[in-house]
Design a protein with these regions (language model features):
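Short, amphipathic alpha-helical interaction segments positioned at domain boundaries
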Residues: 187-214
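A short, conserved structural fragment
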Residues: 80-86, 162, 166-178
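Eukaryotic partner-binding/assembly regions in large regulatory complexes
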Residues: 3-96
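Minor-groove-contacting beta-hairpin "wing" of winged helix-turn-helix DNA-binding domains
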Residues: 91-95, 178-189
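Short alpha-helical segments that sit at the start of domains
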Residues: 30, 97-133
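Short helix-coil junctions and helix-kink-helix linkers
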Residues: 55-66, 102, 140-153
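Short amphipathic alpha-helical interaction segments
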Residues: 65-73, 150-167
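Short acidic, hydrophobic short linear motifs in intrinsically disordered regions
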Residues: 50-58, 126-145
Length: 214
């Protein structure tokens, strides 16, 4: 009986969603499809994006799609065991739940995310909200000072970490990772705090320092 009930509920939800898609224009339906695709790929969508070179901020059209069709997208995601969460403080939409693909970070990528969290915190405390940019030279310096990075990283290690952070909307790069130089600006979004957020930064640093000495 419960299986039949579940099937009927799912069928009704699907019919409702198909009806909804028929009420929007073809272009808007495509926007909804791409936005859902981005949510799964990135896990979050920012309200505002930033150009790291000019610090010019611009509205993200995908965020506006989430706002306009929030109920529909939430219903669609719920069928896939996911939940659409709006975080007004961080100005993001993100997805959580069993249906979300979790990406395992390598130890080095995790360390680099922690370093970015530290740099972001220090910039916010010291220079205000408009100066959350960093660069490879500064990340290396923080790595050396915290003892989280004790050797020269390979190009592949940098690439893996930066691509993952860009994909998940933690940073913005002015171009391809391969073209980054030591002082090319990298913009850090506040979403860097959404990741590894369960512990205090200092606690995280201690944990990963211990991992290196064992």
């Amino acid at each position: 009986e419960s299986i039949k009930l579940s099937y009927d509920t799912g069928k009704k939800a699907l019919e409702k969603m198909l009806q909804y898609m028929e009420t929007v224009s073809q272009g808007e339906a495509e926007n909804i499809r791409k936005t859902i695709q981005d949510l799964f790929r990135q896990t979050c969508i920012l309200q505002v994006k930033c150009d790291p070179a000019t610090l010019v901020q611009h509205d993200n059209p995908r965020y506006q799609v989430c706002l306009r069709h929030r109920e529909f997208i939430a219903d669609y995601l719920s069928v896939l065991d996911c939940e659409l969460v709006h975080d007004p403080q961080e100005h993001i939409f993100r997805i959580t739940g069993d249906g979300v693909m979790t990406e395992r970070m390598s130890l080095m990528t995790t360390k680099l995310v922690i370093l970015l969290k530290m740099i972001y915190r220090d910039k916010i405390m010291g220079e205000g909200l408009h100066a959350t940019t960093t660069n490879l030279a500064e990340i290396r310096e923080y790595g050396k000072n915290t003892n989280l990075i004790t050797r020269r990283l390979t190009g592949q290690e940098w690439n893996d970490a930066l691509v993952l952070m860009k994909t998940h909307q933690m940073i913005e790069l002015p171009g391809a990772v391969a073209n980054l130089e030591d002082f090319t600006p990298i913009y850090i979004y506040s979403t860097v705090n959404v990741f590894c957020s369960a512990m205090d930064i200092n606690e995280l640093v201690r944990e990963y320092q211990n991992e290196m000495t064992e």
